[in-house]
Amino acid sequence: MRRLLPLAGATLLIAAAGGASGQQAGVGSIITRAMFESMLSHRGDQGCQGAFYTYDAFIKAAGDFPRFGTTGNDETRRRELAAFFGQTSHETTGGWATAPDGPFAWGYCRVNEITPSDPPYYGRGPIQLTHKYNYQLAGDALGLDLVNNPDLVSSDPVVAFRTAIWFWMTAQSPKPSCHDVITNQWTPSGDDRSSGRLPGYGMATNIINGGEECGKGYSTDNAKDRVGYYKRYCDMFRVGYGDNIACRDQKPYGGG
């Protein structure tokens, strides 16, 4: 994750109902423990840090967000989870062109940014939370002091997943949330439409890193990598890719 637009009064609404047990029946009914291990089978390999990411941590974190992976019909739910893991797998990838099992079998290899860009607020966790103001926003929403304790994101796997799902679920005006885009809860404005910003996986890429990857008239290597992971997970979940999976013709939001 490269940049978040500031939020006014960012607040995470965590429902008391539908906690971890509810998510075990919801998200866990699509991403079983066996599926999780198959999706991210190389995360614990030599050279990777990803054994840090566990299925139990994912399910526990998802329990704080009752709408995550549970909105809409079965097809929509599967596509959202494929999209979430597609984007976060790119952010944490350890893959290369000739990697065993292919380049898109190496998601969740990294916990920390390879070359820290803004110490101590460099990229951490599945969404690679970066920069002090993003740690502040996420911490305020989650009830954690991430400004003074940024390493919580790389030392507690539940916190790591919570920051990623929080980002996924949270709109950053004028950007919608990735969740609303993928679950068809977002209606593009006139400006969005004239800028080519339409519902689909490509819009999630635009939200996360549009300034660097979108609106160039061609797909960057990073954008292609995001799509490659997404397609792999859609295939594993037996769901179609949907429309507008690329963002090459989408104008990014101001400042990316």
From Swiss-Prot:
Source superkingdom: Eukaryota
Reactions catalysed: Random endo-hydrolysis of N-acetyl-beta-D-glucosaminide (1->4)-beta-linkages in chitin and chitodextrins
GO MF annotations in UniProt: chitinase activity; endochitinase activity
Enzyme Commission number(s) from the entry: 3.2.1.14
Annotated disulfide bonds: C48-C109, C214-C247
GO biological process: cell wall macromolecule catabolic process; chitin catabolic process; defense response to fungus; polysaccharide catabolic process
Keywords, sorted A to Z: Carbohydrate metabolism, Disulfide bond, Glycosidase, Hydrolase, Polysaccharide degradation, Signal
Active-site residue list: E91
Classification via InterPro entries: Glyco_hydro_19, Glyco_hydro_19_cat, Lysozyme-like_dom_sf
Signal peptide extent: 1-22
Tissue and organ expression note: Expressed in leaves and at lower levels in roots, sheaths and meristems.
SUPFAM superfamilies: Lysozyme-like
Pfam families documented for this protein: Glyco_hydro_19
Family that this chain belongs to: Belongs to the glycosyl hydrolase 19 family. Chitinase class II subfamily.
Record's protein name: Chitinase 11
